[in-house]
């Protein structure tokens, strides 16, 4: 009897185990499908991010084109071009601190944080508490912090040299991009900066997020209190031209309407004095982007870093070879501005020095050997494990720690453990898209990685709902990219639709998408979200545009002009802001026509002069001869009719 009971219990246990294994296998497959969906969504976000950065770098080519082709050959346009370069390459004409700050008083009615100079730990605490309450630091204090930071930064070398000990660790943080909650979480988990708790912040403090000013002020105040224990490296977004596109300029002007321009003027110079790297224990190189086969730390140590105003304005001697074949072979190669050999302006770096800085700010590691153009971003290079070994060995270093790239887990180890990427902005693309991370290390020990993710109410939703939301956001921005090239895509589709049936094969559709958009995406896997496919596998290519359109100021505007305006709206806004030297938000009709013709000639947008003249008359809404270009560019936006329900990537 006892044996029978044991047998029944054994059978029941087997069934329970079998059921548990079935559930476990199902859950593993479910998680694997979610990982595939996350991978594809992140690929979309990253490809479009890099494509946008590529466009930003190509503005450099446009500026060079204007200078080389119009200052001498076209008298009508030369005045405008000269003014643009005067505005973008001006010497910082900043008054001394007392004169500058004397114009801005802090009223008694101001109830935000008040700082006392010289700054102490108390001021750090006051600032953190105020920003937690979403208070705004007065412009007077912002400028005072910037002036103090500039004074201290000027005394620093290009590379900060840091020593650690077994009992004294150092923390390394990557990109924060205006995400204040991430910085607060890091300080909560890891402690505030101090003599016993040093930090390295590896660039890209600003842009994209909504609290770039708060992050910058916290970091600079901490730096001023602990200048030997908090180290700030320059990233590719510590650049006033990048800020015009990616949000920090707009944030400053919104938060500091009266004194925003003064803040921007001083900030531009502070950027140029930020160190370009940190070397820990003479073994670990910490830089924002990466390296190239020509990276020379001796050159980087000796150049005058404050001459690098922006990567968009690269100088080069007219008699020097542009030589570096890796740059010329890129389809989006940025041709630097040429100046006469005997007229190199004193504020310019040499071409070699400029390239050295661009490489360490913009480059990315790859598994493939060698060094080749970073065609995704349009600046810097891709460097392989052999390049890493060569550069580290040459400089008697053991490891490279860099940032610059969002990683799903917040960090990534590559090149046989010699390269570490750390990225500290969680939820960078969308809620749940990635974790943030920071690194702790001390002398003679392996780096320790700490991950986190800022949570919000949406994080309480089921996992599949969060994934659906992330996918939906990814496909929206991908469709916006597609609609901006609608005419080109349709021409490419029709080229392969020999029977004019409106259908082509999936392979032909995928080839056309990549050929026109150049995003290096798995188009076949993404096709179910983007286009209608019949049972035979044929693609109804016009269905790509069923649920999206570009809104335009007037119905009579031609499609190619509408798409061009939408596609280049960010570039045009930067250019118009530069032209608008008095910051009125207005440019004249003549300036509009001239700039459009220059832009059209360089970008080969195939817009004839009559269309430009017609466009100019349309956008002069009140017929006063001036154009409010910000309002004009806002008139071009994408309308999503609906989202396709019930589909997923896996």
Curated annotation (Swiss-Prot):
SMART domains: EFh, IQ, PP2Ac. The gene is Ppef1. It catalyses: O-phospho-L-seryl-[protein] + H2O = L-seryl-[protein] + phosphate; O-phospho-L-threonyl-[protein] + H2O = L-threonyl-[protein] + phosphate. Residues 484-519, 567-602, 607-642 form the EF-hand domain. This is Serine/threonine-protein phosphatase with EF-hands 1. Residues 124-456 are annotated as: Catalytic. Activated by calcium. InterPro entries: Calcineurin-like_PHP_ApaH (IPR004843), EF-hand-dom_pair (IPR011992), EF_Hand_1_Ca_BS (IPR018247), EF_hand_dom (IPR002048), IQ_motif_EF-hand-BS (IPR000048), Metallo-depent_PP-like (IPR029052), PPP_dom (IPR013235), PPP_phosphatase (IPR051134). One of its GO terms (biological process) is detection of stimulus involved in sensory perception. PANTHER family: SERINE/THREONINE-PROTEIN PHOSPHATASE 5-RELATED, SERINE_THREONINE-PROTEIN PHOSPHATASE WITH EF-HANDS 1. Keywords: Calcium, Hydrolase, Magnesium, Manganese, Metal-binding, Protein phosphatase, Repeat. Ca(2+) 1 binds at residues 497, 499, 501, 503, 508. CDD domains: EFh (cd00051), MPP_RdgC (cd07420). In the embryo it is almost exclusively expressed in the peripheral nervous system, within sensory neurons of cranial and dorsal root ganglia. Otherwise found in fetal inner ear and a small group of neurons in the midbrain/pons junction. Mn(2+) 2 binds at residues 204, 236, 288, 404. PROSITE patterns: EF_HAND_1, EF_HAND_2, SER_THR_PHOSPHATASE. Residues 16-45 form the IQ domain. Pfam families: EF-hand_7, Metallophos, PPP5. The keyword tRNA-binding does not apply. Residues 335-348 have a biased composition (Basic and acidic residues). Mn(2+) 1 binds at residues 175, 177, 204. One of its GO terms (molecular function) is iron ion binding.
């Amino acid at each position: 009897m006892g044996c029978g009971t044991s047998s029944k219990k054994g059978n029941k246990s087997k069934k329970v185990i079998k059921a548990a294994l079935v559930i476990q296998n199902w859950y593993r497959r479910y998680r694997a499908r979610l990982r595939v969906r996350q991978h594809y969504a992140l690929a979309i976000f990253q490809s479009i991010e890099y494509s946008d950065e590529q466009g930003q770098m190509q503005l450099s080519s446009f500026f060079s084109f204007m200078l080389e082709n119009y200052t001498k050959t076209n008298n009508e346009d030369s005045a405008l071009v000269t003014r643009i370069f005067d505005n973008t390459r001006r010497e910082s004409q900043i008054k001394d601190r007392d004169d500058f700050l004397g114009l801005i008083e802090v009223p008694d009615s101001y109830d935000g944080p008040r700082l006392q100079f010289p700054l102490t730990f108390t001021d750090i605490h006051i600032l953190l508490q105020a920003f937690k309450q979403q208070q705004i630091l007065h412009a007077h204090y912002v400028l005072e912090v910037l002036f103090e930071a500039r004074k201290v930064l000027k005394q620093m070398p290009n590379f900060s040299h840091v020593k650690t000990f077994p009992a004294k660790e150092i923390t390394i943080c990557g990109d924060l991009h205006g995400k204040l909650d991430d910085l607060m979480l890091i300080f909560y988990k890891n402690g505030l900066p101090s003599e016993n708790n040093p930090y390295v912040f590896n660039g890209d403090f600003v842009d994209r997020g909504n609290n770039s000013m708060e992050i910058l002020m916290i970091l600079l105040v901490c730096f001023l209190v602990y200048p030997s224990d908090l180290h700030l490296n320059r990233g590719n977004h510590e650049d006033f031209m990048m800020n015009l596109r990616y949000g920090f300029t707009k944030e400053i002007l919104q938060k500091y309407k009266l004194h925003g321009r003064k803040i921007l003027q001083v900030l531009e110079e502070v950027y140029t004095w930020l160190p370009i790297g940190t070397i820990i224990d003479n073994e670990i190189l910490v830089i924002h982007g990466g390296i190239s086969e020509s990276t020379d730390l001796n050159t980087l140590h000796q150049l005058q870093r404050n001459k690098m105003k922006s990567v968009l304005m690269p100088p080069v001697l007219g008699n020097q070879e542009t030589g570096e074949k890796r740059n010329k072979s890129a389809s989006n190669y940025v041709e630097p501005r040429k100046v006469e050999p005997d007229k190199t302006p004193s504020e310019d770096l040499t071409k070699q020095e400029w390239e050295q800085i661009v490489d360490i700010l913009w480059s990315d590691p790859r598994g493939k050997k060698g060094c080749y153009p970073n065609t995704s971003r349009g600046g810097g290079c891709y460097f392989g494990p052999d390049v890493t070994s060569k550069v580290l060995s040459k400089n008697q270093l053991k490891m490279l720690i860099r940032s610059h790239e969002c990683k799903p887990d917040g960090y990534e180890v590559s090149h046989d453990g010699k390269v570490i990427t750390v990225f500290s902005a969680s939820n960078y693309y969308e809620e749940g898209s990635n974790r943030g991370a920071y690194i702790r290390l001390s002398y003679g020990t392996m780096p320790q990685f700490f991950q986190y993710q800022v949570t919000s109410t949406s994080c309480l939703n089921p996992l599949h709902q969060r994934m659906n939301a992330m996918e939906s956001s990814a496909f929206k921005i991908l469709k916006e990219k597609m609609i901006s090239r609608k005419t080109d895509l349709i021409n490419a589709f029709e080229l392969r639709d020999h029977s004019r049936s409106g259908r082509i094969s999936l392979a032909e559709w995928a080839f056309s998408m990549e050929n026109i958009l150049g995003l290096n995406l798995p188009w076949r896997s993404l096709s179910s979200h983007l286009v209608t496919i019949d049972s035979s596998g044929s693609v109804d290519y016009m269905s790509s545009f069923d649920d999206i359109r570009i809104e335009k100021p007037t119905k009579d505007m031609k499609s190619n002009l509408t798409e061009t305006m939408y596609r280049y709206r960010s570039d045009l806004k930067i250019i118009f802001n530069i032209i608008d030297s008095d910051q009125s938000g207005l440019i004249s009709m003549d300036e509009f026509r001239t700039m459009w013709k220059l832009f059209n000639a360089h970008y080969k947008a195939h817009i004839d002069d009559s269309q430009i003249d017609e466009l100019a008359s349309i956008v002069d809404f009140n017929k006063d001869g001036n154009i409010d270009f910000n309002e004009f560019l806002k008139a071009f936006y994408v309308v999503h009719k609906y989202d396709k329900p019930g589909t997923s990537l896996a």
